[in-house]
Design a protein with these regions (language model features):
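Short, basic-rich loop-to-helix N-cap that marks the start of a DNA-contacting helix
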Residues: 39-49, 67
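A short, Lys/Arg-rich alpha-helix, primarily the initiator
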Residues: 1-13
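Alpha-helical residues within the helix-turn-helix
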Residues: 12, 23, 52
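Short alpha-helical DNA-recognition segment
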Residues: 16-33
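Short, charged recognition helix plus adjacent turn
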Residues: 52, 60-70
Length: 70
């Protein structure tokens, strides 16, 4: 299974820049870049902070892809 986030999707949906989201959740922009590219797994606190910004449930930020399905 591959773990992916929908952070970029939600961010772009509201017209927010990476640096703006980073400021709202108190991290560097590079962290947002890594999250969106699947190179960093967020802490529970960061996940909750991001979900709060978009007014969504934490579960809505993630999806799982089964890489073994043909």
């Amino acid at each position: 299974m591959k773990f992916t986030t929908k952070i970029k999707e939600y961010r772009e949906k509201v017209g927010m820049k990476q640096f703006e989201l980073a400021e709202l959740v108190n991290v560097r922009r590079e962290i947002i870049v890594c999250l969106e590219n699947g190179k960093y797994n967020p802490s529970l606190k960061l996940t909750m902070d991001i979900a709060k910004v978009f007014d969504i449930q934490v579960e809505e930020l993630f999806s799982f892809i089964d890489e073994n399905v043909e």
